[in-house]
Amino acid sequence: MSKLVKTLTVDEISKIQTNGGKPAWCWYTLAMCGAGYDSGTCDYMYSHCFGVKHSSGGGGSYHC
């Protein structure tokens, strides 16, 4: 299962943020985290964008 996880680059995240603004960036990141992609900031995004804190079970980031 870990082979399905892809780390998003800062450029990928920044591109979405500047092109779509905060709401689009939040929903895009939520979708990517839920699909197994992880920028290393999924916990931050859940708490910052949606006010929800998820437990990652270890590595400091959230994987669905």
UniProtKB/Swiss-Prot annotation:
Temperature dependence: Thermostable, activity is retained after incubation at 90 degrees Celsius for 15 minutes.
Compartments in which it is found: Secreted
Keywords, comma-separated and alphabetical: Antibiotic, Antimicrobial, Bacteriocin, Disulfide bond, Secreted, Signal, Thioether bond
GO cellular component: extracellular region
GO annotation (BP), single: defense response to Gram-positive bacterium
Signal peptide: 1-21
PTM (free text): Contains 2 disulfide bonds.
Activity-pH dependence: Stable from pH 5.5-8.5.
General function of this protein: Bacteriocin with a narrow antibacterial spectrum. Antibacterial activity against the Gram-positive bacteria L.plantarun, L.pentosus, L.curvatus, L.lindneri, L.mesenteroides and E.faecilis. Lacks antibacterial activity against the Gram-positive bacteria L.brevis, L.sakei, L.lactis, P.acidilactici, B.subtilis, B.cereus, L.monocytogenes and S.aureus, and against the Gram-negative bacteria E.coli and S.typhimurium.
Protein name, UniProt field: Bacteriocin plantaricin ASM1
Origin species: Lactiplantibacillus plantarum (Lactobacillus plantarum)
